[in-house]
UniProtKB/Swiss-Prot annotation:
Topological category with respect to the lipid bilayer: Multi-pass membrane protein
GO molecular function, one term: NADH dehydrogenase (ubiquinone) activity
Function: Core subunit of the mitochondrial membrane respiratory chain NADH dehydrogenase (Complex I) which catalyzes electron transfer from NADH through the respiratory chain, using ubiquinone as an electron acceptor. Essential for the catalytic activity and assembly of complex I.
The organism of origin for this protein: Martes flavigula
Keyword Nucleus applies: no
Catalytic activity: a ubiquinone + NADH + 5 H(+)(in) = a ubiquinol + NAD(+) + 4 H(+)(out)
GO biological process: mitochondrial electron transport, NADH to ubiquinone; mitochondrial respiratory chain complex I assembly
Lineage: Eukaryota, Metazoa, Chordata, Craniata, Vertebrata
Subcellular location(s) per record: Mitochondrion inner membrane
GO CC annotation terms, alphabetical: mitochondrial inner membrane
Family under the similarity heading: Belongs to the complex I subunit 2 family.
Subunit annotation: Core subunit of respiratory chain NADH dehydrogenase (Complex I) which is composed of 45 different subunits. Interacts with TMEM242.
InterPro entries hit by this protein: Complex_I_Subunit_2, NADH_DH_su2_C, NADH_UbQ_OxRdtase_chain2, ND/Mrp_TM
EC number: 7.1.1.2
Name assigned to this protein: NADH-ubiquinone oxidoreductase chain 2
Length: 347
């Protein structure tokens, strides 16, 4: 894609999200979602092949359905209250309709069907935007309407999401699908705490975005898309591969890495609100995510896959990719745990 066209499309994606973030009027929120959705489709189709076309079509159809449901909820709310204000959501039918629409946009279970397929069908850079930036706008609206949402509906979707996110990733060898299922599980953790502490949900989102950005950037640095290709990178770039494994273990929530913080704080919040069974269930399902990341770490670092290469180290050209953002992302993704007491006092 030519740089001027890419600049226009990316600025539209960013503008759409910012419009959703700053709007207090439902119509401008809906317009922001539409701008964002229409601009992201060309980014998903950056590599013009049948797989990318299929992924873009699945994404477009799902998001269009979610937008229609969102507009339906907005109209129901307008008819009953006569107001377009985002914070004014007294009717349970309107709030439930909007919650389902936002769940479809986020890829929460049982509306998760599109997330692994779309992520697998697009390039790594497009998948990175899909699993990070595209989560901000729906979660910001969910944050604003959280006092009006149905806790039982949110808890059901959260429980299904953490279960599907852990279970679905167990038999995957494609790194993009593993990250997609991990995204579903993380969204489940965020949704679980929305009713009780929405600010904690936004902290979880920030840490999740940092970890996922770091993982995708390291994958793009060495062009890894499968477990096999990642194991071969160990010969070429052992330091980079070890950083990938550290961030992936952080995504799995292994202490003492940063990914343990949101899980710890969310379980603490749920326990404080007498949701003992839900907290226990989520802690157990988190082990599924940790298991497939540990398995990936073992397969990459502690075993050597069959290779036609007879030399231990490979000849390599000088890397020309921009890595400016990687050091701070890696530090944030792995070393934030000592700051947890301060975060607990804030949230």
């Amino acid at each position: 894609m030519k740089p001027p066209i890419l600049t226009i499309i990316m600025s539209t994606v960013i503008s759409g999200t910012i419009m959703v973030l700053i709007s207090s009027h439902w119509l401008t929120v809906w317009i922001g979602f539409e701008m964002n959705m229409l601009a992201i489709v060309p980014i998903l189709m950056k590599k013009f092949n049948p797989r990318a076309m299929e992924a873009s079509t699945k994404y477009f159809l799902t998001q269009a359905t979610a937008s229609m449901l969102l507009m339906l909820g907005i109209i129901i709310n307008l008819l009953l209250t006569g107001q377009w204000t985002v914070l004014n959501m007294p009717n349970p039918i309107a709030s439930n309709t909007m919650t389902v629409a936002l769940a479809m946009k986020l890829g929460l279970s049982p509306f998760h069907f599109w997330v692994p397929e779309v992520t697998q069908g697009v390039p790594l850079s497009s998948g990175m935007i899909l699993l990070t930036w595209q989560k901000i706008a729906p979660l910001s609206i969910l944050y604003q309407i959280s006092p009006s949402t149905n806790p039982n509906l949110l808890m059901t979707m959260a429980a299904l999401s953490v279960l599907v996110g852990g279970w679905g990733g167990l038999n995957q060898t494609q790194l993009r699908k593993i990250l997609a299922y991990s995204s579903i599980a993380h969204m489940g953790w965020m949704i679980a705490v929305t009713t009780y502490n929405p600010t904690l949900m936004m902290l979880n989102l920030a840490i999740y975005i940092m970890m996922t950005l770091g993982t995708f950037m390291l994958f793009m640095l060495n062009s890894s898309t499968t477990t096999l290709s990642l194991s071969h990178v160990w010969n070429k770039l052992p330091l980079t591969t070890s950083l990938i494994l550290m961030i992936m273990l952080s995504l799995g929530g292994l202490p003492p890495l940063s990914g343990f913080i949101p899980k710890w704080m969310i379980i603490h919040e749920l326990t404080k609100n007498n949701m003992i069974i839900m907290a226990t269930f989520m802690a157990i399902t988190a082990l599924l995510n940790l298991y497939f990341y540990m398995r990936l770490t073992y397969a990459t670092a502690l075993t050597m896959f069959p290779s036609t290469n007879i030399m231990k180290m490979k000849w390599q050209f000088e890397n020309t990719k921009n890595t400016t953002l990687l050091p701070p992302l890696i530090v944030i993704s792995t070393m934030l745990l000592p700051l947890t007491p301060m975060m607990l006092s804030l949230f």
